[in-house]
């Protein structure tokens, strides 16, 4: 008799677990797996700004680039958060020596409108005040 009770409890527990995973997709994700995110995610905006600043520092262009469009954002919860960004960057009229992108308009001249599709991976550990650009790749579009 005790065996039947244990079997019924096991089946009921399994049923509830499966039901929870179907109704709550977050439980269905693998721990540490890459999942869809958005720019509203805590830390995403800062991570993308960091990636663009690093991009501007390291490229050989005279002018700053800034984000024209965010195509995709994904995240992976590790020790901190890894953000995966796919964005379109556009050249601005601001020289790198100006350094501030806040009031920097895009170059609107037809022959100067250069855009790049870029993928950035940023690892952010806010409680350690640590952020690093792990990878970046860009190509003209």
UniProtKB/Swiss-Prot annotation:
InterPro entries in UniProt: Cystatin_dom, Cystatin_sf, Prot_inh_cystat_CS
PROSITE patterns: CYSTATIN (PS00287)
Any one GO CC term of the record: extracellular space
Any GO molecular function: protease binding
SUPFAM superfamilies membership: Cystatin/monellin
Disulfide-bond pairs as recorded: 94-104, 118-138
Keyword match Signal: yes
The protein's name: Cystatin-S
Motif Secondary area of contact: chain residues: 76-80
Pfam families: Cystatin
One GO process term, biological-process aspect: response to xenobiotic stimulus
Family of the protein in this entry: Belongs to the cystatin family.
Keyword flag Cytoplasm: no
Site (Reactive site): 32
Alphabetic keyword roster: Disulfide bond, Protease inhibitor, Secreted, Signal, Thiol protease inhibitor
Signal peptide: 1-27
UniProt organism field: Rattus norvegicus (Rat)
